[in-house]
């Protein structure tokens, strides 16, 4: 036998051994059934979602869920008013909405992930049907009367029970149940129409594919790894960039030397879904305003913020406006530095930084002044190592264990399913799916989705949660693994924080479990966790050059990263404040008879608060937060102030961001209660004191001389 034959046989044997080892490891992987006994011991239930496999099954599941829910509502409404109880009314309503939402949550995942367009369409229709039903149950007068009859007995409730009754009655008032029947019906119809339009708005964004062809010369400055990425090279000197794929868009914006290239891609991205969504958004704004006015509110801002920490639209606007003013000196200083770079680059002393320039020149500044090369840094962040490292950190500080288990159904081959247990007691706490890379038709941002929320079930057992993390990190490229940017790593730590918030919940009722907290607080715990990836001690636990794992990120680079972050804070935060400002402005008081022009309202704000734009663009048509976070984007900045304050607990702890005592305190005082108590109480219990704005002002570079301009950032008093 020749040497070649020997080599071939050897390779063949190796492949057989490798394949057999993979079979063994798959066979050894546990299933959810292996944890059911431990769950039962803790009086808990673990549930793998029963995923529908056909469009008809999706539609049937939703119809069945709604029919069962309606039958339960009939039973609540048919009770003798003199015999109603807390359990038979308020708790029963929480049970009904929870059960129906399970089918809607499954449909949402299918809508956002499935590779089959027919499945996605069926799921979209199912979600619309659920949303229509969910609006309608607010107007079940028989159910309302049963709950009101119980409330009129002036029951002696406390804690979470009292909160559930109070907020249920508040929801009815906000739905218009105190209005005359004809006016109430009008509000109901308006809300149903708004719900359908919101689903259309989201779907139009997901469907917006935008391939843009460039030559290699057009893309001068981009790293070779980008050109070698799957799907980029599509012809002889033809490179296709998907403007709707965030990592591709950002890579071009940060690295392309050619301003025309950056502008072209920016304009295309900022006009995605323009024709479909601008009229839809204008209709949504009109409906929101009409609903708010009919319910007795001055604006949709006021309606939305009433149930949040800000309490009024005026408070939210004042907070953002004061931050805009407070950060002005820093923003001006940073902008002047970027303009100097562009002037030198273009030989035009009057060159202005446009909105398609800031990423590129910030990147150049980081390289030149701080020796921070974003592309070079990616070598330290291979996806699997980052994921494993994050798991190790969170398992340690939160007292948890994550174990990969068999997923009975996969909507994509690389889907992963993990089970979470308490590391001390072995109690199963919940499960999470990971769907981490982009593909056509998939949700195109980064988010955690509820599938099964935590809740105390009618049988006395506790339903442990199941969630999904849907992300769009750069895929593997040939022999090179998926390499993440530092921002990607920050995003992963943030989004997985939401998953943990959901999974470890101990709230009794579904409406209070996990991340079901006020919208201007929900981001705070995860924004705090972003601090971890800026800390050398934390990074050393997982970040290493994939080509030589013995090489950690040098301390000097981490130091420069932090310096660059502070140096860019003015630009980055002014951008966030611009989004918050336009969102609030769109939902400000508005004459009922006056049509909306969302672009005419929002584009000038983008220019005034941030940077000059191309007038043909329609940022709002692709700004998904306008459905779901409407009149709520300010909450990122509001929560950021809380997050910066909460981070000080770790910063002062013995082991810093890796401190187990601080981690367990976060789990017990913030994650587990959810919204079962006032979040102000949870925050103060975690801090051990009243809240302070100082850490946030320091974080964004507002010094003592600027504090008067930012004096009304959220404090205990303003909340």
Model-derived features: where do they sit?
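Bacterial N-terminal signal peptides that target proteins for export
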Residues: 2-13
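Bacterial N-terminal signal peptides
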Residues: 12-22
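Boundary at the C-terminal end of the N-terminal hydrophobic targeting segment
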Residues: 24-26
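N-terminal helix-rich structural modules
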Residues: 28-230, 239-240, 650, 656, ...
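C-terminal, non-catalytic "cap/extension" segments appended to globular domains
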Residues: 32-60, 64, 367-368, 385, ...
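Short pre-active-site segment immediately N-terminal to the catalytic Zn-binding motif
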Residues: 474-492
């Amino acid at each position: 036998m020749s040497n070649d034959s020997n080599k071939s046989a050897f390779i063949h044997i190796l492949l057989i051994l490798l394949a057999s080892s993979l079979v063994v490891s798959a066979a050894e992987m546990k299933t959810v059934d292996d944890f059911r006994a431990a769950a039962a011991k803790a009086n808990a239930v673990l549930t793998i979602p029963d995923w529908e496999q056909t469009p008809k099954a999706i539609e049937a599941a939703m119809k069945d869920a709604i029919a069962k829910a309606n039958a339960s509502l009939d039973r609540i409404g048919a009770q003798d008013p003199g015999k109603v109880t807390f359990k038979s009314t308020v708790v029963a309503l929480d049970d009904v909405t929870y059960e129906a939402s399970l089918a809607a949550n499954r449909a949402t995942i299918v809508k956002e992930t499935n590779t089959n367009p027919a499945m996605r369409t069926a799921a979209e229709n199912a979600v619309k049907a659920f949303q229509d039903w969910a609006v309608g149950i607010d107007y079940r007068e028989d159910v309302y009367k049963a709950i009101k009859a119980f409330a009129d007995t002036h029951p002696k409730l406390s804690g979470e029970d009292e909160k559930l009754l109070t907020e249920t009655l508040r929801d009815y008032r906000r739905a218009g149940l105190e209005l005359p029947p004809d006016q109430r019906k009008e509000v109901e119809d308006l809300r149903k129409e708004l719900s359908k339009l919101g689903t259309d708005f989201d779907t139009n964004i997901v469907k917006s594919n935008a391939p843009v062809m460039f030559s290699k010369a057009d893309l001068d400055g981009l790293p070779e790894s980008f050109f070698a990425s799957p799907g980029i090279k599509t012809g002889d000197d033809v490179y296709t960039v998907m403007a709707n794929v965030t990592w591709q868009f950002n890579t071009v914006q940060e690295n392309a030397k050619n301003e025309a290239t950056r502008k072209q891609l920016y304009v295309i991205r900022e006009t995605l879904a323009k024709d479909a969504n601008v009229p839809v958004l204008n209709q949504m704004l009109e409906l929101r305003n009409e609903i708010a006015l009919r319910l007795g509110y001055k604006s949709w801002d006021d309606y939305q913020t009433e149930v949040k920490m800000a309490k009024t639209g005026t408070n939210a606007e004042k907070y953002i406006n004061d931050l805009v003013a407070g950060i002005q000196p820093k923003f001006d200083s940073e902008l002047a530095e970027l303009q100097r770079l562009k002037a030198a680059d273009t030989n035009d002393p009057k060159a202005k930084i446009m909105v398609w320039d800031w990423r590129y020149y910030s990147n150049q500044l980081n390289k030149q002044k701080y020796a921070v090369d974003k592309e070079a840094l990616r070598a330290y962040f291979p996806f699997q190592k980052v994921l494993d490292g994050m798991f190790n950190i969170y398992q340690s500080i939160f007292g948890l264990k994550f174990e990969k288990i068999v997923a009975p159904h996969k909507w994509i081959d690389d889907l992963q399913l993990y089970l979470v247990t308490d590391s001390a007691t072995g109690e199963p706490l919940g499960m999470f799916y990971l769907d981490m890379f982009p593909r056509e038709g998939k949700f195109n941002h980064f988010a955690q989705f509820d599938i099964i929320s935590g809740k105390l079930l009618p049988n006395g057992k506790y339903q442990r949660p199941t969630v999904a993390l849907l992300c769009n990190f750069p895929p593997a490229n040939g022999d090179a693994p998926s390499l993440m940017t530092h921002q990607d790593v920050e995003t992963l730590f943030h989004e997985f924080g939401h998953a943990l918030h959901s999974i470890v919940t101990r709230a009794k009722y579904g409406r209070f479990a996990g991340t079901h907290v006020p919208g201007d607080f929900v981001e705070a715990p995860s924004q705090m966790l972003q601090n971890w990836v800026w800390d050398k001690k934390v990074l050393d636990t997982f970040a290493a050059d994939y080509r030589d794992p013995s090489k950690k990120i040098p301390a000097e680079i981490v130091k420069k990263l932090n310096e660059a972050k502070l140096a860019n804070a003015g630009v980055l935060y002014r951008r966030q404040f611009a989004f918050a400002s336009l969102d609030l402005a769109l939902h400000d008081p508005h004459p009922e008879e006056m049509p909306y022009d969302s672009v005419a309202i929002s584009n000038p704000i983008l220019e005034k608060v941030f940077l000059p734009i191309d007038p043909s663009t329609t940022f709002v048509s692709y700004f998904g937060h306008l459905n779901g976070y409407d009149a709520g984007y300010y909450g990122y900045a509001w929560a950021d102030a809380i997050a910066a304050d909460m981070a000080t607990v770790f910063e002062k702890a013995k082991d810093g961001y890796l401190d187990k005592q601080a981690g367990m305190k976060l789990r017990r005082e913030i994650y587990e209660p959810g919204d079962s108590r006032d979040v102000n109480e949870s925050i103060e219990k975690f801090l051990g004191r009243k809240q302070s704005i100082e850490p946030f002002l320091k974080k964004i570079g507002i010094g003592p001389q600027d504090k008067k301009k930012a004096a009304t950032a959220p404090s205990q008093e303003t909340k």
